[in-house]
Protein backbone atom coordinates (compact mmCIF):
# COMPACT_ATOMS: atom_id res chain seq x y z
CA UNK A 1 0.00 0.00 0.00
CA UNK A 2 1.21 3.51 -0.83
CA UNK A 3 2.66 5.37 2.22
CA UNK A 4 0.40 8.36 1.51
CA UNK A 5 -2.66 6.09 1.62
CA UNK A 6 -1.46 4.59 4.90
CA UNK A 7 -1.07 8.06 6.36
CA UNK A 8 -4.63 9.01 5.35
CA UNK A 9 -5.98 5.72 6.70
CA UNK A 10 -4.17 6.27 10.01
CA UNK A 11 -5.54 9.81 10.27
CA UNK A 12 -9.09 8.58 9.68
CA UNK A 13 -8.69 5.84 12.31
CA UNK A 14 -7.34 8.31 14.87
CA UNK A 15 -10.21 10.70 14.10
CA UNK A 16 -12.78 7.95 14.56
CA UNK A 17 -11.16 6.84 17.80
CA UNK A 18 -11.26 10.40 19.09
CA UNK A 19 -14.90 10.78 18.07
CA UNK A 20 -15.80 7.59 19.93
CA UNK A 21 -14.60 8.98 23.27
CA UNK A 22 -16.19 12.43 22.95
CA UNK A 23 -19.39 12.54 25.01
CA UNK A 24 -22.57 13.27 23.06
CA UNK A 25 -23.59 16.90 22.92
CA UNK A 26 -26.95 17.83 24.40
CA UNK A 27 -29.39 17.66 21.50
CA UNK A 28 -32.08 19.46 23.43
CA UNK A 29 -29.99 22.63 23.70
CA UNK A 30 -30.29 23.08 19.94
CA UNK A 31 -34.08 22.98 20.27
CA UNK A 32 -34.01 25.29 23.30
CA UNK A 33 -31.89 27.75 21.30
CA UNK A 34 -34.47 27.71 18.50
CA UNK A 35 -37.31 28.24 20.98
CA UNK A 36 -35.52 31.25 22.47
CA UNK A 37 -35.04 32.74 19.01
CA UNK A 38 -38.71 32.11 18.19
CA UNK A 39 -39.97 33.76 21.37
CA UNK A 40 -37.72 36.81 21.14
CA UNK A 41 -38.06 37.06 17.35
CA UNK A 42 -34.28 36.83 16.99
CA UNK A 43 -33.75 40.12 18.84
CA UNK A 44 -31.04 38.79 21.17
CA UNK A 45 -28.45 36.09 20.42
CA UNK A 46 -28.91 33.00 22.57
CA UNK A 47 -25.31 33.09 23.80
CA UNK A 48 -26.20 36.29 25.72
CA UNK A 49 -28.09 34.04 28.13
CA UNK A 50 -25.30 31.47 28.60
CA UNK A 51 -23.40 33.30 31.37
CA UNK A 52 -26.01 35.63 32.77
CA UNK A 53 -26.61 36.12 36.47
CA UNK A 54 -26.40 33.24 38.94
CA UNK A 55 -28.53 30.66 37.10
CA UNK A 56 -28.29 31.16 33.33
CA UNK A 57 -25.83 28.64 31.91
CA UNK A 58 -24.36 25.53 33.47
CA UNK A 59 -25.13 25.09 37.15
CA UNK A 60 -26.51 27.79 39.35
CA UNK A 61 -26.96 28.79 42.94
CA UNK A 62 -27.52 31.56 45.41
CA UNK A 63 -30.07 34.29 44.89
CA UNK A 64 -31.15 35.21 41.38
CA UNK A 65 -30.02 38.75 40.52
CA UNK A 66 -33.09 39.83 38.53
CA UNK A 67 -36.18 38.71 36.61
CA UNK A 68 -34.21 37.17 33.74
CA UNK A 69 -32.03 35.21 36.15
CA UNK A 70 -35.21 33.99 37.89
CA UNK A 71 -36.36 32.67 34.48
CA UNK A 72 -33.19 30.55 34.41
CA UNK A 73 -33.63 29.45 38.02
CA UNK A 74 -37.19 28.33 37.24
CA UNK A 75 -35.91 26.50 34.13
CA UNK A 76 -33.27 24.70 36.21
CA UNK A 77 -35.93 23.66 38.74
CA UNK A 78 -38.22 22.52 35.93
CA UNK A 79 -35.49 20.29 34.50
CA UNK A 80 -34.98 18.91 38.01
CA UNK A 81 -38.65 17.91 38.12
CA UNK A 82 -38.48 16.40 34.61
CA UNK A 83 -35.51 14.26 35.70
CA UNK A 84 -37.83 12.53 38.17
CA UNK A 85 -39.76 11.00 35.26
CA UNK A 86 -38.63 7.51 34.15
CA UNK A 87 -35.60 7.62 31.84
CA UNK A 88 -35.92 11.38 31.40
CA UNK A 89 -32.70 13.28 30.69
CA UNK A 90 -33.75 16.86 29.89
CA UNK A 91 -30.43 17.88 28.31
CA UNK A 92 -30.60 15.04 25.78
CA UNK A 93 -34.33 14.47 25.29
CA UNK A 94 -35.68 15.90 22.04
CA UNK A 95 -39.30 16.85 21.56
CA UNK A 96 -41.80 18.04 18.96
CA UNK A 97 -42.91 21.67 18.91
CA UNK A 98 -44.10 24.39 16.57
CA UNK A 99 -43.10 28.03 16.35
CA UNK A 100 -45.56 30.30 14.61
CA UNK A 101 -45.16 34.07 14.77
CA UNK A 102 -43.41 33.89 18.14
CA UNK A 103 -45.94 31.46 19.65
CA UNK A 104 -44.49 28.16 20.87
CA UNK A 105 -46.60 25.01 21.06
CA UNK A 106 -45.41 21.67 22.47
CA UNK A 107 -46.72 18.69 20.50
CA UNK A 108 -45.81 15.57 22.51
CA UNK A 109 -48.29 13.75 24.75
CA UNK A 110 -49.02 15.49 28.05
CA UNK A 111 -47.25 13.77 30.94
CA UNK A 112 -44.46 12.39 28.75
CA UNK A 113 -40.81 13.23 29.35
CA UNK A 114 -40.67 14.93 25.96
CA UNK A 115 -43.65 17.15 26.78
CA UNK A 116 -42.28 18.01 30.22
CA UNK A 117 -38.91 19.07 28.80
CA UNK A 118 -40.60 20.99 25.98
CA UNK A 119 -42.82 22.81 28.47
CA UNK A 120 -39.76 23.73 30.57
CA UNK A 121 -38.06 25.19 27.49
CA UNK A 122 -41.22 26.90 26.19
CA UNK A 123 -41.93 28.62 29.51
CA UNK A 124 -38.28 29.69 29.84
CA UNK A 125 -38.09 31.02 26.27
CA UNK A 126 -41.25 33.09 26.80
CA UNK A 127 -39.92 34.29 30.16
CA UNK A 128 -36.62 35.36 28.54
CA UNK A 129 -38.52 37.26 25.85
CA UNK A 130 -40.48 39.22 28.46
CA UNK A 131 -37.68 39.94 30.94
CA UNK A 132 -35.42 42.99 30.79
CA UNK A 133 -31.76 42.30 29.99
CA UNK A 134 -29.17 44.02 32.19
CA UNK A 135 -25.71 43.99 30.59
CA UNK A 136 -24.17 44.38 34.08
CA UNK A 137 -25.37 40.86 34.93
CA UNK A 138 -23.60 39.20 31.98
CA UNK A 139 -20.51 37.25 33.10
CA UNK A 140 -20.75 38.33 36.73
CA UNK A 141 -18.50 36.70 39.31
CA UNK A 142 -20.40 33.74 40.75
CA UNK A 143 -18.18 33.76 43.84
CA UNK A 144 -18.89 37.44 44.58
CA UNK A 145 -22.55 37.69 43.55
CA UNK A 146 -24.23 34.32 43.93
CA UNK A 147 -23.52 33.05 47.44
Swiss-Prot record:
GO cellular component, one term: extracellular region
InterPro entries reported for this sequence: PLipase_A2, PLipase_A2_Asp_AS, PLipase_A2_dom, PLipase_A2_dom_sf, PLipase_A2_His_AS
Residue numbers annotated as active site: 75, 121
Positions bound to Ca(2+): 55, 57, 59, 76
Function: PLA2 catalyzes the calcium-dependent hydrolysis of the 2-acyl groups in 3-sn-phosphoglycerides.
Biological process terms in GO annotation: arachidonate secretion; lipid catabolic process; phospholipid metabolic process
Annotated family: Belongs to the phospholipase A2 family. Group I subfamily. D49 sub-subfamily.
EC number: 3.1.1.4
Signal peptide: 1-19
Propeptide span(s): 20-27
Assigned keywords, A-Z: Calcium, Disulfide bond, Hydrolase, Lipid degradation, Lipid metabolism, Metal-binding, Secreted, Signal
Comment on bound cofactor: Binds 1 Ca(2+) ion.
Catalysed reaction, written as an equation: a 1,2-diacyl-sn-glycero-3-phosphocholine + H2O = a 1-acyl-sn-glycero-3-phosphocholine + a fatty acid + H(+)
Cofactor: Ca(2+)
A Pfam family annotated for this UniProt entry: Phospholip_A2_1
Tissues expressing this chain: Expressed by the venom gland.
Provenance organism: Bungarus flaviceps flaviceps (Red-headed krait)
GO function term, MF aspect, one: calcium-dependent phospholipase A2 activity
Name of this protein: Acidic phospholipase A2 1
